[in-house]
Amino acid sequence: MSLMTKLGLRTLVASCLIAVGGAAHAQLNVLVTGVGSTQFPIATANFANEANSPQQVSTIVRQDLQRSGKFTNIDAGSTPVAETDSVDLGSWKAKGANAFVSGSVNRLPNGQYEVRFKLYDTVKGESLGGLVLVSPESGLRMSAHKVADYIYAKLMGGRGVFATRLSYVIKTGGRYQLQISDSDGQDAHIALSSPEPIISPAWSPDGTKVAYVSFEKKKPIVYIHDLPTGRRVVVSDQKGNNSAPAWSPDGRTLAVALSRTGNTQIFAVNADGSGLRRLTQGSSIDTEPCFSPDGQSIYFTSDRGGQPQIYKMSAQGENAGAAQRVTFTGSYNTSPRVSPDGKQLAYISRVGGGFKLYIQDLQGNTATGLTDTTHDESPSFAANGQYILYATQVNGRGVLAAVSTDGRTRQVLSVQGGSVREPSWGPFMQ
């Protein structure tokens, strides 16, 4: 069986594991392991007036911080504290909190909601600022995620990814659904529903579009789906298989895997479907392309050495220079994804008959396994490079999971009674 057939069958079988009736609701269940004393203690008070709000903003903030694995929540009691209230920072420090958050949620005359908050450093006894966020009711959860991102940035020194989105595929009642949700799996909505499989969703760099492969016409075709409008464009409908779309960092080009010439090869195509050009040359199976963050290189899976391994070539194709092998740990490595800073490579390695998520330092080439599961697939880096989202199985059921790049923090995103696969973590919101 060819490499492309193996990879394709594994993807399709995984996404067809369980068919269920009724609605599927994503719920993030968090297991934080191995962090210990490295967690930052923070107290987030209930926000003033949020009891009358359709969303409990402070609760969402606490949940975001907890699931990051970098914070531990100190009990702030049930009394609401507004951002304008006087705060005894010494008392909160005595309770073990190194930071304190207060805020309010108010409905404006025009029906929108205003979230205000203030962050304090209790150790230094000073304010670390805050924000005023205005949104419609439907945007309140995202406002809460932005509060958590602000806190993360101020206390951790890097950008948070709470206000980002996920895409994934759920099969329910004989239909496949491409769903878009918040980073915690909540506020999910269906972008596409089809009786045929949907695979390989990939976010555009600006977060407004998702490319994917749909079998709705009884063959794999690559589409670009504009999320705000719902408009779709066919990017590749060539003879044979059209698969594995990957965006260039500038959003102008996609790399795709096509079998139009026989064996699957990697091509580049403009985002409007024009300008198709072949990038890999030869008789091997080349698939699963992924651009480097600077857009100068493409990583991909190839069996040119006999077994699937990950290679790197110029984004201009092999005519600009022969591809170089990247992975040397293990005899079967697939599904490359490069971290946003270009320093790490996530991929799936076959280990003892199972498939596990690995991460490799691209400078030192050291490879490390990150999971204890054996059905891992489809890795996707968070926009800040601190976490990797992937699909796996727990108790025989397809779930999504996220793990920190040091392997210490793990999260599981499961669908009650159903199976969820094909994850992709979206970029920072514009």
Curated annotation (Swiss-Prot):
Disulfide bond positions: none
Protein task: Part of the Tol-Pal system, which plays a role in outer membrane invagination during cell division and is important for maintaining outer membrane integrity.
Family matches, as Pfam families: PD40 (PF07676), TolB_N (PF04052)
Lineage, highest ranks first: Bacteria, Pseudomonadati, Pseudomonadota, Betaproteobacteria, Burkholderiales
Superkingdom of the source species: Bacteria
Signal peptide range in chain numbering: 1-26
Keywords: Cell cycle, Cell division, Periplasm, Signal
Major subcellular site: periplasm
NCBIfam families, per database record: propeller_TolB
UniProt record similarity statement: Belongs to the TolB family.
Organism this protein belongs to: Paraburkholderia phytofirmans (strain DSM 17436 / LMG 22146 / PsJN) (Burkholderia phytofirmans)
Record protein name field: Tol-Pal system protein TolB
Gene Ontology biological-process entries: cell division; protein import
Matches recorded under Gene3D superfamilies: TolB, C-terminal domain, TolB, N-terminal domain
GO CC annotation terms, alphabetical: periplasmic space
Matching InterPro entries: 6-blade_b-propeller_TolB-like (IPR011042), PD40 (IPR011659), Tol-Pal_TolB (IPR014167), TolB_N (IPR007195)
Record localization: Periplasm
Oligomer and partners: The Tol-Pal system is composed of five core proteins: the inner membrane proteins TolA, TolQ and TolR, the periplasmic protein TolB and the outer membrane protein Pal. They form a network linking the inner and outer membranes and the peptidoglycan layer.
